Curated annotation (Swiss-Prot):
InterPro entries: Metallo-B-lactamas, RibonucZ/Hydroxyglut_hydro, UPF0173, UPF0173_UPF0282_UlaG_hydrolase. Belongs to the UPF0173 family. It holds the Pfam family Lactamase_B_3. It comes from the Bacteria. It comes from Anaeromyxobacter dehalogenans (strain 2CP-C). Keywords: Hydrolase. GO terms for molecular function: hydrolase activity. This is UPF0173 metal-dependent hydrolase Adeh_1068.
Length: 274
């Protein structure tokens, strides 16, 4: 075999090896099964959304909450691209800083809270003007668009030393997945007339992740009214039962809805496709 033939043979072998490796590299990225968007509840208001394109969004990642399916989850998530924090309270900021340091996840929240989280240790280069915003703003997050929408609550942030910092305005999130569902995470909120505008602005909401616990947020009766404003295909209750004070239940939500919407209670740690 001539030197030219040997070179061509080596190139062909390298090309075949690259083609064989390509599926392995692709499979290392967490993509939702069969082109669906996977939503995993980790208890309280904490969710991880994985899009068909492999973008991973962690919402209000208090993964050490009492309903979490196992301990140490903040150190076990294989990939997080973006962390969405609805407001500054400890049970929503949760493990955001630890997850960000380990995964390189960018922060999506209001500008004031973002600045306070950076001061508390969130990596500054992962919390810039490209992902910090405010009410009404839309952030492109891979193959998902995240819009910050109204929530009626409070948002003070207290760091590990007990020092208070500005938390900006609380918010919910509307996540529009390219070629996939529109997901509305209410954040912590009371019933608000602004919810009526969501279908006009975003079209049909496929999945509404709604607080129902009461005391600090809507109770099941108010959440049922909110569902009537938004008209989602599926309602997923959250922010209930973590503490004795937030005593609203999914059964109470179902009763208040009177069959007007599907209520789907997720099992912590088990992904569900939409």
């Amino acid at each position: 075999m001539s030197s030219a033939s040997r070179s061509l043979a080596r190139l062909a072998a390298l090309a075949l090896a690259a083609l064989a490796a390509a599926p392995l590299a692709a499979s290392a990225q967490p993509k939702a099964a069969r082109g669906k968007t996977e939503v995993t509840w980790y208890g309280h208001a904490a969710f991880v959304v994985t899009t068909p394109g492999g973008t991973v969004l962690a919402i209000d990642p208090w993964l050490s909450n009492p309903k979490a399916p196992e301990p140490g989850l903040a150190g076990k998530l294989p990939k997080v691209d973006y962390i969405l924090v609805s407001h500054g309270h400890f049970d929503h900021v949760g493990d955001a800083i630890a997850i960000a340091k380990r995964t390189g996840a960018k922060l999506i929240t209001n500008f004031d809270l973002g600045s306070s989280l950076v001061a508390a240790g969130y990596p500054k280069d992962q919390a810039g003007m490209d992902t910090l915003g405010n009410m009404g703003g839309t952030i492109q997050a891979g193959d998902a668009a995240v819009t910050m929408v109204t929530a009626v609550h409070s948002s003070g942030f207290t760091d590990e030393k007990g020092t208070g910092h500005p938390g900006g305005n609380p918010m919910g999130f509307v996540i529009q997945v390219k070629g996939g569902p529109t997901i509305y995470h209410t954040g912590d909120t009371d019933l608000t007339q602004d919810m009526k505008q969501l279908p006009e602005r975003f079209g049909r909401v496929d999945v509404m992740l709604t607080c129902i616990g009461g005391h600090f947020t809507m109770d099941p009766k108010a959440a049922a009214i909110a569902v009537g404003y938004v008209h989602p295909r599926t309602v997923v209750p959250m922010h209930f039962g973590t503490f004795p004070a937030i005593a609203g239940t999914p059964d109470e939500l179902r009763a208040a809805l009177k069959g007007k919407a599907e209520v789907r209670v997720l099992e912590p740690g088990k992904p569900v496709g939409f």
